[in-house]
Design a protein with these regions (language model features):
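Regulatory N- and C-terminal appendages and interdomain linkers associated
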Residues: 23-97, 318-322, 385-389
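ATP-dependent phospho-/nucleotidyl transfer catalytic cores
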Residues: 188-299
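Conserved ATP-binding subdomain of kinase catalytic cores across diverse folds
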Residues: 89-230, 299-302, 318
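Catalytic-loop signature of eukaryotic-like protein kinases
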Residues: 170, 305-314
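C-terminal catalytic region of ATP-dependent kinase domains
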Residues: 253-264, 274-281, 301-302, 314-389
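Bacterial N-terminal signal peptides that target proteins for export
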Residues: 2-12
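Bacterial N-terminal signal peptides
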Residues: 11-20
Length: 389
C-alpha cells in the first residue's frame, strides 16, 4: 500500500505543477539566434533539445489516460498529435526554435516509463530541418537499449549500410530535465541524405500482429505479417512510380508469405530468415552485402531487427533489389552479452547455415578495415563516452 501511494505521488506531483503553468504560444516560423550562414553550415551535431507543449494540460490528460489504461499496449487513440515549440542548440552554439507536432510513440508502455509526463515522442518539424531531417523519434533511452542503439547504428553506417542518424542528447520536456535518443525516421529525406534516388520504402506491416498468441508474436511467427510501402506520396507521382511500387510490394510479400508458411525452413539452401533472392537481376555483390548485414546484426545482439515485422527496406528499381535498412535491433553490443531468447526465432538446431557462415567471413573482413580512431571520434560526437584503451 505504501509503495503504491509513493508511485501515485511520483506520477502526480510533476503533473500538477505542469497543469498550473500557463499555456505556450506556437512559434509561427523557424527562428534562430543568428543569420550567419556559416553557423548553419557548421551545425553538424545537436547539443541539447528543449520541448515545450503549447497546451500542457491536454498533454498531461492524454498521458495520464494512456498510463492508466490496463492494456500493456499504448492504444492508437492516445497517439494524437500536439503542437509544440522545439528549441535545438547545436555544437557551434547556433540555437533555433522549430514549430512542431509531437505525439506519444511506441507500442508498449515502457515508452511512458520516465519522469511523468515524459514519453517517447514522434516529432515532425513544421518549418525548417535539422541537417535535412524533418521527421524523427525521441526515445526514452531504455526503450532502445540506451548506448547500444547508438553504437549499432553508428557501426552500420560506418560499414556503409543504411541506418538512421542516432545520438544521445540532453533534453528538457516542459522544463523537466531528461535524456532522449534522437533517431531520424526512414523517410524521403533519409533516402536523399544517403545519395539514393527516391523510390519505395517498405517495412513489415504490424497492423494485424496484436491479434495473435503472445508466444508466437515473440518469435515473429505471424501468418498475417506482410510488407507495406511507407512513402505513399511517391506512389502518387505517376504510372511509373505506381508500377515500380506494385512490383516492389509483390516481390517482398512473396518473401513474407514464404516465411510465414515456414517454407524457408525446408529450403535446400538452409535459409532461415527472409529470403530476398527473388529477382533475376540480383548480383553477387548484393548477396554478399545482405549476408554481411545479417551476420553483423546477429553478432552485435541485434537479431530483433531481423524479425520480419521489424524489417525496413529501400527498393532499388534499377536492380530490383531490396537494400536492408537497420531499425529497432534491440542491440546488446555495449553490454557484451547475448540473449539466447532473441535468437530463438532464427535458430532451429545447433548449426549455422551457409549464409550465416559466409556472411560472418564478410563481416570480419569489413571490421578489420575499420579505422578505429575515426570511428571512436564519431561515437564521441554521438554522445557516447567510450575509450580506445
Amino acid at each position: 500500500m505504501h509503495n503504491t501511494l509513493n508511485k501515485i505521488q511520483f506520477i502526480l506531483f510533476p503533473l500538477l505543477v505542469l497543469i498550473l503553468i500557463s499555456p505556450n504560444v506556437l512559434a509561427n516560423k523557424l527562428s534562430c539566434n543568428t543569420n550567419n550562414i556559416d553557423k548553419f553550415i557548421g551545425a553538424e551535431n545537436i547539443k541539447s533539445i528543449d520541448i515545450s507543449t503549447v497546451k500542457s494540460k491536454k498533454w498531461v490528460k492524454n498521458y495520464l489516460n494512456a498510463y492508466k489504461e490496463p492494456n500493456k499496449i499504448i492504444l492508437e487513440k492516445y497517439k494524437k498529435k500536439f503542437l509544440a515549440n522545439i528549441s535545438i542548440r547545436f555544437n557551434n552554439d547556433l540555437e533555433c526554435i522549430f514549430p512542431s507536432k509531437i505525439r506519444i510513440n511506441g507500442d508498449y508502455k515502457d515508452h511512458l516509463e520516465s519522469t511523468p509526463p515524459i514519453a517517447s515522442l514522434d516529432v515532425e518539424l513544421l518549418a525548417g530541418n535539422i541537417n535535412s531531417t524533418i521527421k524523427f523519434k525521441l526515445f526514452i533511452p531504455h526503450t532502445r537499449g540506451g548506448e547500444n542503439e547508438v553504437f549499432a547504428t553508428a557501426l552500420l553506417k560506418e560499414l556503409k549500410f543504411l541506418a538512421p542518424k542516432t545520438l544521445i542528447v540532453p533534453a528538457t520536456f516542459n522544463d523537466i530535465k531528461t535524456t532522449f535518443i534522437f533517431q531520424e525516421k526512414i523517410t524521403k529525406e533519409f533516402i536523399e541524405s544517403n545519395h539514393l534516388r527516391e523510390a519505395p520504402i517498405l517495412e513489415g506491416d504490424e497492423r494485424f500482429r496484436w491479434n495473435i498468441d503472445p508466444n508466437e508474436r515473440a518469435l515473429g511467427l505471424n501468418p498475417f505479417t506482410l510488407a507495406r510501402i511507407t512513402n505513399n506520396k511517391w506512389i502518387e507521382k505517376g504510372y511509373t512510380s505506381l508500377n515500380i511500387s506494385k512490383d516492389a510490394l509483390e516481390q517482398l510479400n512473396k518473401a513474407y508469405l514464404n516465411y510465414s508458411s515456414y517454407q524457408h525452413f525446408s529450403n535446400s539452401n538452409g535459409e532461415n530468415l527472409l529470403n530476398l533472392k527473388l529477382s533475376d537481376f540480383i548480383n553477387e555483390n548484393y548477396i554478399k552485402k545482405e549476408r554481411e548485414f545479417k551476420a553483423i546484426l546477429i553478432a552485435i545482439g541485434s537479431s530483433h531487427g531481423l524479425i520480419p515485422h521489424n524489417r525496413s527496406f529501400y527498393y532499388d528499381p534499377i536492380y530490383r533489389t531490396f537494400n536492408s535498412i537497420y531499425y529497432d535491433g534491440d542491440s546488446t553490443v555495449v553490454n557484451l552479452k547475448s540473449s539466447n531468447r532473441k535468437l530463438d526465432f532464427i535458430k532451429f538446431g545447433s548449426y549455422l547455415n551457409n549464409d550465416e557462415i559466409i556472411g560472418s567471413s564478410y563481416a570480419i573482413e569489413s571490421l578489420n578495415k575499420l579505422n578505429q580512431k575515426i570511428f571512436h571520434k564519431k561515437l564521441l560526437d554521438l554522445g557516447l563516452k567510450f575509450s580506445l584503451e
